[in-house]
Amino acid sequence: MGEKQILDADDIRRAMTRIAHEIVERNAGVRDVALVGVRRRGVPLALRLAAALEEIEGVRVPVGILDITLYRDDLGIRGPAPVVHATDIPFDINGRTVVLVDDVLYTGRTVRAALDALTDFGRPARIQLAVLIDRGHRELPIRADFVGKNVPTSRDERIATRLHEVDGGVDGVFIVRVSESTTE
């Protein structure tokens, strides 16, 4: 299994800054905007976006954490005892523009689970999706509103995102070649 780096820490920072500007532009500011990071790597990306939005607009945007474990459609094949983490959305999402944040968009199934989980907390005015990487291969009709980088991949490749808040070390995004017997 080999890996090839496609984004380094500076590339990730620039992508997140650009996405923050796009969020401001699309929503005519950040009034009534909230960010919700999909656990695990969506959370630090949401916090980074919030910091960038505050720098651009001078307004602190609320950030929530969403665990989708029990909403996944592959729960039965992922193992007998899923580890469920806390969801923490300490603000009312009703009537807000909620930007879901995740690291990689692939089949769309994680986003579908996140939408199901999020709507259990209320009825946002709209939900937008921000991802660091869109790798294609959609199985559901889901499209990101904000994309850091489009990275076409083959089915025998996966994207590995490393963020210092979760993984330690230096930030980076890598394409990793995997064998056909390995599942993502």
Swiss-Prot record:
Q: Which reaction does it catalyse?
A: UMP + diphosphate = 5-phospho-alpha-D-ribose 1-diphosphate + uracil
Q: Which EC class is this protein assigned? A: transferase
Q: Where is this motif: PRPP-binding?
A: 98-110
Residue ranges crossing the lipid bilayer per the database entry: none
Domain of life where this protein originates:
Bacteria
What's one GO MF term for it?
uracil phosphoribosyltransferase activity
Q: Which InterPro entries match?
A: PRibTrfase_dom, PRTase-like, PyrR, PyrR_bifunctional
Q: Which UniProt keywords apply?
A: Glycosyltransferase, Transcription, Transcription regulation, Transferase
Q: What is its EC number?
A: 2.4.2.9
Q: Does the keyword Transcription regulation apply?
A: yes
Q: Name one GO biological process term.
A: regulation of DNA-templated transcription
| Functional note | Regulates the transcription of the pyrimidine nucleotide (pyr) operon in response to exogenous pyrimidines. Also displays a weak uracil phosphoribosyltransferase activity which is not physiologically significant.
Q: Which PANTHER family match?
A: BIFUNCTIONAL PROTEIN PYRR
What family, per the record? Answer: Belongs to the purine/pyrimidine phosphoribosyltransferase family. PyrR subfamily.
Q: What is this protein called?
A: Bifunctional protein PyrR
Top-level taxonomy: Bacteria, Bacillati, Chloroflexota, Chloroflexia, Chloroflexales
